[in-house]
Amino acid sequence: MLTTVLGPEGYAAMLAGNPAGAVWAVDHGDYAPDSVEYTCVAGVVLRRDLPLDQWRGIYGDVDGLLAAGVLEASPTDATRAHITVDIRPVAARGTESAEVLIVSDQDSSMTARTPAPNHVPGVGNAPLSLLSVLPPVSDAQRAGSPPLRVLDLGTGSGVLATVLATSHSAVEVTATDISSRALGFARCAFPQHASIDWVEGSWFEPVEGQLFDLIVSNPPFVIGPDCGLSYRETPLDFDGASRLVVEQAAQHLANHGTAHLLAAWALTEADSAASKVTGWIPGEDIRAWVVQRDLVDITTYVHTWLTDEGIDTRSSEGIKRTADWLDYFMGAGITHIGMGYVHMKRTTGTSSEVTFEVMDQALQPGTFLGHETREWFARAEWLDRQDAHSVLDTQYAARPTLALEHVSVSDGDLGVGFKDYALRLSRTDGPAWSHEVDQHVAAIVKGINPDGLTLRDTAELYAAVNGLDGDAFTDALAPIVVDLVRHGLILPADIVEEL
C-alpha cells in the first residue's frame, strides 16, 4: 500500500526521513483525502492530524483509542486527532507471504522527537536489512519435517519473529527481550499467534539449554559510552554485545541449524576486522560467512547515531555528546567501526571455517540476498569436499546472470583512441561480485558446459590449441575456479539443481 499511495518518489522520501516530501506526494497522489488508503498512509504512517471521522473509517469506534492515548486530540481542534504510535506493514522477502502490521513507538523520521530510554523501535533499517539476507524457507522444503525451531533474540517490537511466524506454517518461534514494554508492543502485532512464545529475559538466559534450527538477532550493537537507550546500547564495552551474541548463538544451534546476525566491530589501526570477528567464533563445528557491509570512521559513526537519536549535532548538547563519544573511542585507540552480517551454520566433527568478505559494492535498490546466503553455504560445502584434482574433473555451468566486461580507457600515449584496460567477469544479480581475469580464463568460462567436457578436458584442449603447457595451465586454473565458484560466477553441474 505504501508504494502504491506514495509513489516511488514519495516512498523514497519517507524512507529518507523527509516527511514534507512524503506528505506532498500523498496530497498530490491518486487517492482522495477521505479514502481509507489516504487515511492509512497520511494518518498512520506520516502522522498527520486528521478528522475523527476519517479515523473512524479505519478503526471504527475511536473512543477507546483516545482514552488509551493511541490517538491524541489536536490541541486546537477537538474534531481532529493524530496517532501516537507507529504502525508499519512488513513482509518476508523472497516469499509471497502477506504483510503484517508492526506496532512500536514513533521515531524521529516523521516528527521531531527524542526517544525515551525505554523506546521500542519498529520497522527500521536494521530489521529490514536483516530480512533482506535471510534465506527463505518454503513449506515444501519443510514437508514431512518437524516444525522449524526459531529464536529471535532481542525481538523488540517483534518484526523478525512475526514475519517468520506468519511466513511459514511449520514454525515454532521463541522471541525474547529484556523489555516487557517491547514485548507488549510485539504482542499487538499478532497477539493470538500460537507459534510465537514471547519470553522476557536477558540475552540467552530465557533459552538456556535449548537448541534452534534458525537464530536471528538484531541486537543492541551501537557502540557508545553509555547505555541510555536500551534498544540500541548495552553496558558491555565496545563490541561486547556483538561478540556475546555471536559466541552464544553458535552454542544454541542444532545440527545443520543456521544463525543470521547483525553485528558491529570496533577497530584500532592495528586491528584486522577478519581476525577480530573470527576470534568470536568457536573453533569447532561452525561454518561462518562474515560480510562487512560498512566501515566508517568514528566521526561519521557518532554523527549518524546522534542524528538517529534526534540530536542536532550543531546544538550545544550535540557538540558535547559528540566530544564525549569521540573521547571514549580515542581513549581505547578505536578509529573505525565495521558493521555487517554474521551467518553461521552448525556442522559436526570438523574444525570451524570462517570466510570474511567485504561487500561494499553498490547494489541495486531493494536487492534481496536471502537466496545468495543459502547458496553461499551450498557452494562452500561443495568446495569443502574437493581438492585440486576433483575441481578440475568437474563440469561447470556459467551463471545465467554472468557478464563479461571489456573495459577500455583512452590512450594517453597516442592521444587518440582507446586501449584495453581490464577484462572482468561480473554477476549482474544479487551481490554483484566482479572478478578481474585474463583472456585465457575468460575463454575457458566461455567454453564450460554442464553437459559437456570437464574443466580439465576443456583447459587441456585450450592449452593444446594455443601452445600452452597443459599441466602448468590447469594447475594455475584450479584456484581461480575455486574463487569463481565461491562467489557463484560459475556453478558445479552436480549442485545446480539443488540451488
Which residues does each predicted region cover?
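Conserved SAM/SAH cofactor-binding pocket of Class I
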Residues: 124-217, 223
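Flexible, glycine-/basic-rich loop-and-beta segments that form/coincide
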Residues: 298-377
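SAM-dependent Rossmann-like transferase core, predominantly class I methyltransferases
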Residues: 74-150, 157-159, 163-166
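Mobile active-site "lid"/loop adjacent to the S-adenosyl-L-methionine
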Residues: 180, 217-244
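Conserved Class I SAM-dependent methyltransferase catalytic core
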Residues: 238-292
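Long, charge-rich, low-complexity alpha-helical segments
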Residues: 34-86, 131, 135, 140-146, ...
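Short beta-strand micro-motifs in enzyme catalytic cores
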Residues: 100, 338-342, 421
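Acidic, low-complexity/disordered tracts enriched in E/D and polar residues
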Residues: 1-40, 110, 349-446, 491-499
